[in-house]
């Protein structure tokens, strides 16, 4: 089987890094097209031996990109097209159908209750998504929670397949030597209580809650923020206003897989932490929380379908917290005073092993390739309405 993956961009983000990890485990010849921003993940894919093409799309309404994408698909001789993220799903599914490819799969990585990929949901966004969804054969939800959201939109249940995000368990396994080396490299005191936060620095992630919580914790507590984005300067100002700027470390965007760039990779940073916080009130999956669990960390979160969709006993040291600095400060103070537990990987993290996700996705591919040709139907009025 030969597959083409179409994604909106390849900067450092959860969906982008998930695609790179998946391609390492899929027994499929795969190429990648990025509509925009061939960033660090594009470089990583090329290093992995994947052919990456930058379409050079100027914006959401750059209709001239559509015929370029159609020509690229036709020339590639692909058996299947797999799209990722909103813009790539809308343009990619249409281009694939025009190019004559009928086996089309799309993954919905980032659908919240009121936003998608950090943007507010509108009737127009839903309507366009549903119209393009009919052009494919399967829509992959990264969690049962996302599946329910898609069904409420009007996507028929039989068209939705749940394939959770996956992680490389061995890569995130706790390593005490790596912890010591990473703390020394970052200038973190060896005996400091280090709170971790991982993700895009956008307003919706609510990392400001974690920053303000630090003002209520003892001076030996640090906040290690891993990620980049438009809210970094806002968070720095918030830290200064709260009087904790000297105890907050911005590590920037860090690769999932070591790529030779200066600075530790994401698993090393996880080893350096004592607890992970996720103050985001809307998540489609909660990949950072699962990665933290794989490293044996306690997790305190506001929304995390990856944890909530599993039995309660799957992970012992996880707690749901309200999105409030005082609530986070209180639960972090409890973690700080408890004797440290062995950093073992719980069942919840093992449930999301990347090889398991790759196997499930291959089943979706097989079904999409074998399915009979059907004409796309118009989206229902129910699906288009807010």
Regions found by a protein language model. Give the residues of each.
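A conserved mid-protein helix/loop that constitutes part of the nucleotide-sugar donor-binding site
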Residues: 13-21, 193, 197-216, 230-236
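Carbohydrate-associated surface elements
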Residues: 145, 166
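Aromatic "clamp/platform" in nucleotide-sugar-dependent glycosyltransferases that forms part
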Residues: 281
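Nucleotide-activated donor-binding/catalytic signature segment of Leloir-type glycosyltransferases, i.e.
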Residues: 236-260
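N-terminal strand-loop element at the rim of the active site
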Residues: 5-64, 149, 229-230
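Conserved acidic donor-binding segment of nucleotide-sugar-dependent glycosyltransferases
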Residues: 313-326, 334-337
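Short alpha-helical donor nucleotide-sugar binding micro-motif in glycosyltransferases
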Residues: 73, 253-254, 261-264, 268-273
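Short hydrophobic beta-strand element within catalytic cores of glycosyltransferases
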Residues: 34, 298-302
């Amino acid at each position: 089987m030969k597959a083409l993956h179409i994604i909106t961009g390849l900067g450092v983000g959860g969906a982008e890094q998930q695609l790179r990890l998946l391609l390492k485990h899929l027994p499929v010849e795969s190429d990648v097209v990025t509509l925009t921003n061939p960033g660090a993940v594009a470089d990583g894919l090329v290093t992995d031996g994947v052919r990456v093409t930058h379409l050079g799309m100027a914006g959401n309404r750059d209709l001239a990109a559509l015929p370029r994408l159609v020509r690229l698909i036709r020339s590639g001789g692909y058996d299947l097209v797999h799209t990722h993220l909103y813009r790539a799903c809308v343009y990619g599914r249409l281009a694939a159908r025009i190019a004559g490819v009928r086996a089309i799969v799309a993954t919905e990585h980032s659908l919240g209750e009121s936003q998608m990929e950090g943007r507010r949901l509108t009737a127009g966004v839903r309507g366009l998504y549903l119209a393009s969804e009919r052009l494919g054969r399967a829509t992959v939800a990264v969690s049962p929670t996302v599946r329910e959201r898609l069904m409420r939109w009007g996507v028929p249940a039989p068209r939705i397949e749940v394939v959770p995000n996956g992680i490389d368990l061995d890569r995130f396994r706790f390593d005490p030597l790596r912890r010591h080396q990473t703390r020394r490299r970052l200038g973190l005191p060896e005996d400091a209580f280090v709170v971790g936060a991982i993700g895009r620095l956008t307003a919706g992630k609510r990392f400001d809650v974690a920053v303000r919580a630090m003002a209520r914790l003892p001076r030996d507590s640090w906040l290690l923020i891993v990620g980049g984005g438009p809210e970094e300067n806002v968070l720095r100002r918030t830290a200064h206003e709260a009087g904790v700027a000297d105890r907050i470390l911005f590590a920037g965007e860090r690769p999932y897989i070591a790529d030779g760039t200066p600075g530790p990779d994401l698993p090393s940073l996880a080893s350096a932490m004592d607890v992970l916080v996720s103050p985001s009130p809307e998540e489609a999956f909660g990949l950072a929380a699962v990665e933290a669990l794989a490293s044996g960390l306690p997790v305190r979160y506001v929304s995390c379908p990856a944890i909530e969709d599993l039995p309660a006993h799957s992970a012992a040291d996880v707690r749901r917290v309200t999105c409030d600095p005082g609530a986070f400060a209180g639960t972090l103070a409890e973690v700080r005073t408890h004797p440290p537990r062995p950093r073992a990987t719980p069942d919840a993290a093992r449930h999301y092993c990347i090889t398991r996700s790759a196997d499930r996705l291959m089943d979706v591919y097989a079904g999409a390739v074998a399915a009979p040709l059907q004409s796309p139907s118009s989206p229902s009025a129910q699906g288009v309405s807010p």
